[in-house]
């Protein structure tokens, strides 16, 4: 019997269980979202019936297949648990069927069965259904593990209240800030809080000394470490480097920590202040924190979605004043915070006005606690979502929207339950019509945003402050009179050079000497080697010229077609082939021309080889998803694929080189069949979001795509025609206006 094999298998089992839990949660969320969208769109079934069929089929097929696999998994769990049962006493103490044992290990070995029952009743994962009492023994292990890491924190608060009545009395705040409701929302933070806070001294480790008699609190830091923990800490101390605490991570983006929330003069304090306020530690810990006992590891996106946020403070189609908390250029988003009167308790924690209990062990994954920033002298709320591959943990500052690395030797504190349950201040915001990279200069200032979309998790907004749209001033270089910047750029332009004089003069290196025989004799029309010579027997070009040239191909003999000219003001027939936007479509004139399409039999494999690599703007034959080839023009080139435009239908695709074939001159010189048509009287709505744009395109597809109709040519545009719909389609512009997809053109 090898215990190392069992340990490795157990580690693999735990890792797979965490992945399974995360996948089940994300899958359930996605299916509920699809079901919600399907239910909402059923009210417009007459308009979107065709587009709802694939959505309905996908939902039914996916749920059926996943349900089958889940049922098989439950059966396998039941079979395997029946086969590995221990003795009666041992099984009751260690089995996963015993809810008390798992909850006891996840919540610091609480031995009260009543507390364990409260936990099981008050917290369970969203994807686990309620089972009857007769089948409670078959509840998967997921339900037990998740009981200690749920977002609600209700079960944890119940256990904490039942542990000891001593914890019910929360120490009163030692310094109270003045009323902040009188501040103007357009002022920055330092103007709001200036002069309203008492100075708080910074000292050694936190111990509530002034209220020991009335409010004793048992500190988890006072518990002696076990022999296993001591050996673990001793091994880690060999590579531990004492820095300045978590501030090394937070200070990389310290602009998201307002300077006014820091203590300006921590050394200039009176004796009365020192006696009044308990000192907080400023330096990092000398030993590592114990790892979390429970919880579920999640991704960065999942931990953000799990945390409670006050999304109701940002209603749609309104202008809201908020603080720009941080900017994430890599994810192309920003985080905004309201910081209104409902966050006063969070501000007191941030300003170190509340006595907190220091912890020696990290809370469960997903649990909210506080951490000390020793450089900025602030305490902020934080949660850890997963362990890092290189050591430490991935953590998330819930009030500033920053993901940081947590070493495990920081100074952390336990938060009161009421502060834990307060919504997170940082809310993800996808800003449109602005450059995210230029938003760093507005961090920690109030900005006004127009909220276009609020999906209860993320905002889609647009900044409306004038200074955000002002161009940044750049230092211009003064040039002598009469010389412009373009002239100086032309003078300073130095092309790539070469040390080969032939390549510098001709642009290439001739290969005459490598190709022509040096012993060629015109009288013999050969050389002394006879037929054994492998070089070309011809004279060199006179005067050092070269014969190494490539002849251009002759012009093809073909008949060029001309485009049909249509008179402005006439009524013509068109076929809509592609919807390019809310007010623009692509189509063909119905002039009786046969369609330009090639079957795979017309383009066999031996005809799909290019003599040279295709270049930009070349006309080629491109394979479409229906198995046929159509004319296309190369408009961009990438390492493994090409971006092409179907010149006869108007759609754009990305295809590899294997899906392209040469197009003969007789076909490539024919005029493009597709034209751009703009709808008269309307333009794209300024407030149209990306999601609304997709909805508008789907709506126009159901109405216009692959439809032949008569239209009135109103005007010739540089890139197409301005048309007016007739007959059954004349109400299309009005319907687009009613749905807020477009607005009246001026």
Curated annotation (Swiss-Prot):
Domain writeup: Possesses two tudor domains, a C-terminal canonical tudor domain and a central non-canonical tudor domain. Both tudor domains can interact with Piwi proteins allowing the simultaneous binding of aub and AGO3; this brings them in close proximity to facilitate their role in ping-pong ampification of piRNAs. The canonical tudor domain possesses a hydrophobic pocket that preferentially binds methylated aub; the interaction requires symmetrical methylation on at least one aub N-terminal arginine.
Family designation: Belongs to the Tudor domain containing protein family.
Deletion consequences: Females are sterile due to defective oogenesis; defects in germ cell meiotic progression and loss of dorso-ventral oocyte polarity. Oocyte nucleus fails to form a compact karyosome by stage 3 of oogenesis. Precocious translation of osk mRNA prior to stage 9 of oogenesis, probably due to defective RNA silencing.
Pfam families assigned to the protein according to its UniProt record, in alphabetical order: TUDOR, Tudor_krimper_1st
GO biological process assignments: negative regulation of oskar mRNA translation; oocyte dorsal/ventral axis specification; oocyte karyosome formation; secondary piRNA processing; transposable element silencing by piRNA-mediated mRNA destabilization
Region of interest (Involved in homooligomerization), ranges: 1-310
Function: Stable structural component of the perinuclear meiotic nuage, a germline-specific subcellular membraneless ribonucleoprotein compartment involved in production of transposable element-repressing Piwi-interacting RNA (piRNA)-induced silencing complexes (piRISCs), which are essential for maintaining germline integrity during oogenesis. Scaffold component of the ping-pong piRNA processing (4P) complex that recruits the Piwi proteins aub and AGO3 to specific subregions of the nuage where it coordinates their activity in the ping-pong amplification step of secondary piRNA biogenesis.
Species, as recorded: Drosophila melanogaster (Fruit fly)
Keywords: Cytoplasm, Differentiation, Metal-binding, Oogenesis, Zinc, Zinc-finger
Mapped zinc finger ranges (C3H1-type): 511-540
Subunit structure: Homooligomerizes (via N-terminus). Component of the ping-pong piRNA processing (4P) complex consisting of krimp, aub and AGO3; a single molecule of krimp can bind both aub and AGO3 without the need for homooligomerization. Interacts (via canonical tudor domain) with aub (via N-terminus when symmetrically dimethylated on arginine residues). Interacts (via non-canonical tudor domain) with AGO3 (via N-terminus when unmethylated on arginine residues); this interaction leads to symmetrical dimethylation on AGO3 arginine residues and its subsequent dissociation from krimp.
Family annotation (CDD domains): Tudor_dTUD-like (cd20379)
Name under which the protein is recorded: Tudor domain-containing protein krimp
UniProt cross-references to InterPro entries, sorted A to Z: SNase_OB-fold_sf, Tudor, Tudor_domain_containing, Tudor_krimper_1st, Znf_CCCH
Region ranges (Non-canonical tudor domain): 311-489
Example of a GO cellular component annotation carried by this entry: P granule
């Amino acid at each position: 019997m090898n215990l190392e094999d069992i340990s490795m298998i157990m580690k693999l089992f735990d890792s797979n269980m965490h992945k399974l839990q995360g996948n089940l949660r994300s899958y359930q969320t996605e299916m509920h979202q699809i079901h919600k969208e399907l239910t909402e769109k059923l009210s417009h079934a007459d308009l979107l019936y065709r587009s709802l069929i694939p959505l309905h089929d996908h939902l039914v097929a996916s749920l059926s297949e996943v349900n089958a696999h889940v049922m098989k998994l439950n059966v396998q769990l039941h079979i395997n648990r029946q086969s590995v049962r221990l003795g009666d006493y041992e099984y009751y103490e260690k089995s996963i069927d015993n809810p008390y044992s798992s909850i006891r290990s996840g919540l610091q070995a609480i031995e009260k069965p009543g507390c364990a029952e409260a936990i099981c009743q008050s917290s369970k994962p969203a994807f686990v259904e309620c089972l009857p009492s007769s089948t409670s023994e078959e509840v998967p292990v997921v339900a037990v593990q998740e009981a200690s890491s749920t977002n609600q924190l209700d079960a944890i608060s119940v256990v904490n209240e039942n542990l000891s009545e001593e914890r019910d009395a929360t120490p009163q705040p030692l310094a109270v800030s003045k009323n902040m409701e009188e501040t103007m929302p357009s002022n920055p933070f330092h103007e709001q809080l200036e002069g309203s806070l008492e100075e708080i001294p910074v000292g050694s480790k936190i111990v509530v000394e002034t209220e020991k008699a009335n409010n004793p609190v048992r500190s988890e830091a006072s518990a002696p470490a076990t022999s296993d923990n001591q050996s673990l800490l001793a091994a880690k101390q060999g590579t531990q480097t004492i820095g300045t605490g978590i501030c090394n991570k937070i200070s990389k983006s310290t602009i998201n920590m307002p300077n006014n929330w820091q203590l300006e003069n921590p050394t200039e304090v009176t004796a009365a202040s020192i006696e009044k306020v308990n000192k907080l530690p400023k330096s990092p810990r000398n030993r590592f924190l114990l790892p979390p006992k429970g919880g579920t590891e999640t991704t960065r996106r999942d931990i953000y979605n799990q945390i409670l946020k006050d999304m109701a403070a940002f209603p749609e189609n309104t202008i809201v004043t908020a603080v720009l908390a941080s900017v994430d250029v890599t994810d192309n988003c920003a985080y905004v915070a309201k910081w209104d009167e409902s966050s006063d308790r969070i501000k007191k924690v941030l300003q170190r006005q509340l006595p907190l209990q220091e912890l020696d062990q990290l809370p469960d994954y997903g649990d909210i606690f506080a951490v000390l920033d020793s450089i900025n002298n602030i305490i902020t709320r934080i949660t850890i979502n997963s362990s890092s591959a290189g050591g430490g943990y991935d953590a998330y500052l819930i009030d500033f929207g920053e993901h940081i690395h947590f070493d495990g030797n920081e100074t952390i504190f336990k938060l009161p339950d009421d502060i834990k349950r307060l919504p997170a201040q940082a809310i993800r915001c996808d800003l449109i019509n602005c450059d995210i990279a230029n938003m760093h200069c507005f961090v920690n200032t109030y900005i006004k945003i127009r909220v276009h979309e609020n999906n209860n998790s993320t905002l889609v907004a647009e900044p409306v402050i004038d200074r955000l749209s002002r161009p940044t001033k750049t230092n211009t270089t003064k040039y002598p009179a009469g010389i412009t910047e373009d002239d100086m750029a032309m003078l300073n332009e130095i092309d790539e050079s070469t040390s080969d004089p032939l390549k510098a003069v001709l642009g290439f290196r001739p290969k005459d000497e490598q190709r022509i025989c040096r012993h060629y004799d015109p009288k013999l029309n050969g050389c002394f080697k006879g037929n054994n010579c492998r070089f070309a027997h011809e004279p060199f070009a006179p005067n050092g010229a070269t014969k190494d040239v490539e002849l251009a191909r002759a012009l093809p003999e073909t008949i060029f077609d001309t485009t049909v000219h249509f008179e402005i003001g006439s009524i013509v027939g068109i076929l809509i082939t592609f919807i390019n936007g809310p007010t623009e479509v692509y189509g063909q004139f119905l002039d009786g021309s046969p369609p330009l399409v090639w079957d795979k039999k017309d383009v066999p494999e031996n005809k799909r080889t290019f003599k040279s690599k295709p270049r930009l703007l070349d006309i080629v034959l491109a394979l479409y998803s229906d198995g046929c080839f159509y004319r296309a023009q190369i408009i961009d080139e990438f390492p493994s694929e090409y971006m092409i435009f179907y010149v006869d239908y108007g759609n754009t695709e990305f295809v590899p080189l294997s899906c392209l074939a040469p197009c003969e001159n007789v076909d490539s010189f024919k005029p493009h069949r597709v034209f751009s048509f703009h709808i008269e009287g309307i333009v794209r709505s300024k407030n149209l979001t990306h999601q609304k744009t997709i909805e508008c395109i789907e709506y126009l597809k159901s109405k216009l795509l692959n439809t032949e109709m008569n239209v009135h040519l109103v005007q010739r545009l540089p890139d197409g025609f301005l048309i007016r719909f007739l007959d059954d389609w004349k109400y299309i512009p009005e319907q687009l206006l009613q749905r807020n997809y477009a607005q009246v053109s001026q």
